[in-house]
A protein has these predicted regions:
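Active-site palm subdomain of RNA-directed nucleic acid polymerases
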Residues: 55-85
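Basic, alpha-helical interaction scaffolds
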Residues: 142-214
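Conserved pre-catalytic core of RNA-dependent polymerases
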Residues: 1-48, 86-87
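Short, conserved non-catalytic motifs in the polymerase core
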Residues: 31-57, 85-91, 160, 182-193, ...
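Mobile genetic element proteins and their domesticated derivatives, centered on retroelements
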Residues: 7, 20, 31, 50, ...
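RNase H-like, metal-dependent ribonuclease domains
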Residues: 128-131, 139, 186-190, 194, ...
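Catalytic palm subdomain of template-directed nucleic-acid polymerases
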Residues: 1-10, 83-107, 162, 217, ...
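Short, conserved micro-motifs composed of acidic
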Residues: 35, 100, 114-148
Length: 523
């Protein structure tokens, strides 16, 4: 099989290849229509729909597709949608490059026994210049049709009035869904109002959220059209008359104004890319930004970080090398008897000292803690040699603070001639570290990276969860240190992007509530 051969080329060998071969062989399908079931038909091509392994195998199949691209031609792939593009000042140069690429794609498809339907393909010019002539670009001798707009991942790209075309397309979809919503909303036995609002948010307004990094370029007039769609849908969901003021409508529904939420989600998208660092698709292979933000987006992000009193340089990002395994250190969450909170504080203390004496007698002990109050968010760490106390950005959650405390302890309190025992009362941080995945918070990846660095100097690193406020003197000292922070203590400016997004969302909702409170409709 072609796919198995490609897997072997990629270095996927052994039993996994045999399993994949068995998984793909002798597959059949049947079609169910109402209560009838069709006959069995063998599947000769393709991958099973809905299978977890199918997307991975499809990526393996397309792994060498980039070799078909001529120099200067780029591509974007999502599932089986391929978007090939080229930019240059001369049209003849672009035509030649694209034609060469199409010929290479045809050879590649023939070699790997893959069929492409050229009649389903299209080509468009997205430059601001008027074309002197329409170049002829073919695939397998079939001329690719030129179109005014080209659709990729549900977004219409156009040379003229792109925002207007996108809005028109989304608006037509939204109106169809609003009409469908009316059929279930105007009934005494229909869904609850809360569920109808969720339908509006997740089915209608989400059409605008999906492409927020593009729709945030709308003009104010186009934004008003978006808001009209939202208020129309909410009136149907709430069963309120047309003359209900929009500000009252938003307050009752507990929703943000759609145009403001689009801008917020766009900002969150760009912040997330900053946090992903070199692993973000906006960076090229040389770790340099491959795209440039337009002026409006730059101003939006600058204003946001000014409002939050921080900068993009202080966002906790993915480490350059991602960690794909979770067994890089020992993590004890419920392995010892003292980790049972049902015990009394005095018993927990005695059991802890017994475990340390038996299991960690020669370890260098470090305890960390974090504190969050109306005045400060702080972290602290202590060992029998030294200690530290820092203020951190108040936006950071207590989860982020606890993780940063361990990171700082590894930097400042470690010794090179002993194994390390780190004590923390944050169960959630250790649980996240133990279950490390690509989707884990960035601060957990930062912590994992620091542990791996320290493992070069230590035989063992053990992290142990200790119940809080249980008279364990190490924890009590760290807790006291964290709570004694003042303005004079040094500031660590690191901030988690997850906390920025959470804070930004809170501020946005507060602005909606303030608008209502300052309106004439507030009693």
């Amino acid at each position: 099989m072609v796919l198995i051969f490609k897997c072997l080329q990629l270095g996927i060998t052994g039993n996994i290849t045999k399993i994949l071969h068995n998984f793909l062989q002798n597959r059949t399908l049947q079609v169910r229509w109402r209560n009838s079931l069709s006959g069995t038909k063998p599947v000769q091509k393709g991958l099973p729909q809905g299978s977890v392994v199918s997307p991975i195998l499809f990526v393996c199949f397309l792994a060498d597709f980039s070799e078909t691209l001529d120099v200067g031609v780029e591509y974007s792939i999502f599932a089986d949608d391929i978007f090939i593009f080229c930019a240059h000042t001369y049209l003849d140069h672009i035509s030649k490059k694209l034609q060469n690429t199409m010929e290479n794609v045809y050879k590649w498809c023939n070699y790997w026994k893959l069929n492409i339907s050229p009649e389903k393909c299209s080509i468009a010019d997205l430059s601001k210049k008027k074309l002197p002539s329409i170049p002829r670009i073919t695939y397998a001798g079939f001329p690719l049709p030129w179109k005014q707009t080209i659709k990729y991942l549900g977004i219409n790209f156009s040379k003229i009035n792109q925002n207007g075309i996108i809005l028109k397309n989304i608006r037509s979809k939204a109106l169809r869904k609003i009409n469908a919503l009316k059929s279930i909303a105007y009934k005494n036995y229909g869904p609850r109002t809360k569920d109808l609002i969720n339908i509006v948010n997740n089915s209608i307004c989400s059409l605008f959220y999906y492409s927020c990094s593009i729709t945030n370029k709308f003009s104010e007039t186009q934004y008003k059209a978006c808001n009209t769609i939202q208020t129309m849908a909410l009136r149907v969901a709430l069963g309120l008359p047309k003359w209900t003021p929009n500000i009252v409508l938003m307050k009752i529904a507990g929703q943000e104004v759609l145009s403001k939420k689009i801008k917020r989600l766009a900002a969150q998208f760009f912040i997330r890319q900053l946090a992903n660092g070199v692993h973000s698709p906006i960076y090229d292979q040389n770790c340099k930004p491959s795209i440039k933000l337009i002026k409006r987006d730059e101003v939006m992000l600058a204003n946001l970080f000014t409002e939050l009193d921080t900068s993009t340089d202080h966002i906790i990002a993915f480490p350059d090398t991602l960690i794909s395994r979770s067994n890089f250190c020992e993590i004890f969450l419920s392995d010892f008897s003292f980790q049972n909170k049902a015990h009394s504080a005095f018993l927990i203390k005695d059991l802890f000292e017994e475990v340390v004496y038996k299991e960690f007698q020669d370890y260098h002990i470090i305890a960390t803690d974090a504190s969050k109050s109306h005045s400060f968010t702080s972290i602290a760490g202590i060992s029998n040699l030294q200690s530290f106390v820092y203020r951190i950005h108040p936006i950071n959650s207590i989860f982020t603070a606890e993780a940063l405390a361990i990171c700082q302890a590894l930097d400042e309190l470690s010794v090179t001639d002993k194994n390390l025992l780190l004590l923390t009362d944050s169960y959630s941080v250790l649980q996240a570290l133990k279950c490390l995945t690509i989707k884990s918070p960035k601060v957990i990846h930062r912590l994992a990276g620091k542990i791996l660095v320290r493992k070069n100097f230590h035989q063992k690193i053990s992290l142990v969860w200790t119940p809080g406020h249980s008279l364990i003197h190490w924890n009590e000292k760290a807790d006291l240190l964290a709570k004694t922070v003042t303005e004079s203590h040094p500031l660590l400016e690191w901030i988690a992007y997850e906390d920025i997004i959470s804070r930004y969302q809170t501020i946005s909702l507060q602005k909606t509530n303030l608008s209502f409170q300052h309106s004439k409709y507030q009693e």
